[in-house]
Amino acid sequence: MTIKIAIDCMGGDHGVSVTVPAAISFLASHDDAAVVLVGLPDAIQAQLKKLRAQDHPRVSVVPATEVITMDDPVEVALRKKKDSSMRVAVTQVKEGLAGACISAGNTGALMAVSRYVLKTLEGIERPAIATTIPNEQGWGTTVLDLGANADCEPEHLLQFARMAEAMVAVVDHKEHPTVGLLNIGEEVIKGNEVVKRAGELLRASELNFHGNVEGNDIFKGTTDIVVCDGFVGNVALKSTEGLAKMIGGMIKEEFTRSWFTKLLAGIAMPVLSRLAKRLDPARYNGASLLGLRGLVIKSHGSADAHSFEWAIKRGYDAAKNGVIERIARAFADKTSAAGAAPASPETAPTPHPSTRAA
């Protein structure tokens, strides 16, 4: 069974110098995968030649004549750059030529292009951005939305929870994962009207709802999933990234302050190495755009090759485990349970040809 991954090679701060090496490294550890490199052919081929991978049997190149920059507004991405590497890569997923698309490009453009090309699954009003944040338990907490929807209705938060539950169940192999609603306190009376109403909907749902959680619960691993609107989620994510960077810098500064602290650093190196591995941001790179009729993974724009490879792995795992099919099935089941007409074939899509037995 071959899993094909389409890669927007031109996206992000570093383009082909990161995306192509990451793709080749990924293939070295995944014999059942293939990559479709999308972008300016000359730039891609030059990188493949450097890596002596120009004849790799599991690499194909699909040309695109345009590049969406990190500063391009959504209107430009959608209306003017119709042959961008980002759009062509997403189209590979739509046409069943790839099981997932990975891009480090402009987040707003990627969401807009993906929603325009792939459309949302039946029963889902808004896609959401989800990622995993490290916690004390060691497996990470899935948090969404991280910026796609600054303003949400209570029903949207319920939908986000259902999408995340479906993803975590198949990717992390956790049936009935716990769900928490991010709030300013655990009490049901806390929060604004949207959050309080969302709590009521979650408590009445079939989900394994833990209740309200606070920001520190994300890192405790109190629940497997934490749901919030995109405004709160984005602030939480950026604050987490900033804090981690600050603490890392402070530790480095203290351990290099004198010859004695450098000696202590050498003694503590095994412990520091294990800690660095647990908190390695590269392992958590790759946010999933949930709710679409195809898999799209957003890598951090400044990712290096090691970090981008983890984003590819995230897309590979999601495609291999049938995340889209699981989400579609969850919403189709809810529609049927509510007495609606049976789901159409579009509601529960069959696996992409790229994920079937080769």
Curated annotation (Swiss-Prot):
One of its GO terms (biological process) is fatty acid biosynthetic process. Homodimer. Probably interacts with PlsY. GO terms for molecular function: phosphate:acyl-[acyl carrier protein] acyltransferase activity. Belongs to the PlsX family. NCBIfam families: plsX (TIGR00182). The gene is plsX. It is found in: Cytoplasm. Keywords: Cytoplasm, Lipid biosynthesis, Lipid metabolism, Phospholipid biosynthesis, Phospholipid metabolism, Transferase. Pfam families: FA_synthesis. This is Phosphate acyltransferase. One of its GO terms (cellular component) is cytoplasm. Catalyzes the reversible formation of acyl-phosphate (acyl-PO(4)) from acyl-[acyl-carrier-protein] (acyl-ACP). This enzyme utilizes acyl-ACP as fatty acyl donor, but not acyl-CoA. It catalyses: a fatty acyl-[ACP] + phosphate = an acyl phosphate + holo-[ACP]. Residues 336-358 are annotated as: Disordered. It comes from the Bacteria. PANTHER family: FATTY ACID/PHOSPHOLIPID SYNTHESIS PROTEIN PLSX, PHOSPHATE ACYLTRANSFERASE. Its EC number is 2.3.1.274. The lineage of its organism: Bacteria, Pseudomonadati, Pseudomonadota, Betaproteobacteria, Burkholderiales. The keyword Cytoplasm applies. Pathway: Lipid metabolism; phospholipid metabolism.
